[in-house]
């Protein structure tokens, strides 16, 4: 699978100009969460899915998800570890890498439709990242803050440090896009720290 480095136009759309972490996050882009974004490719085949991590704080990692090299939505993960730093269970993001993406794994947590009614249309099935080193059950799902993820990738629209909004409509749009991909062709996702980004140090004693 080809990994696309964001172009200058796409970086502007995703606000990857990389100011100091936690400051001057992208203004709300109201087109991001419409049913048919102008940035969404009309093709059914997905050649690449990439999460570029662009903003790092001591609490969270903000990024941008690209499909076939085009900006699709913002992402939020737990804070990212500097290379060699130990994992803090439930508090740190997954390692950079390329992972098989499955759409056939039902999450027990999100199968509780009383508390997660947005998951009912998908029968509790979330995009599942396979074989992530040191992590189990890594999903792409709905949420707003670092408290909503223990290592998973949240999707939405970034409007403030450590916070995303419009997560439910963004997730719906993502699922509809992924489901259009031919089932017999494997899906993969690449998670990368943007080369211009800077990691915030993590206090190992916390």
Listing of model-derived features with the role each one plays in the protein:
Residues 2-6, 11, 33-187, 193-198:
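Cell wall/extracellular polymer interaction/catalysis modules
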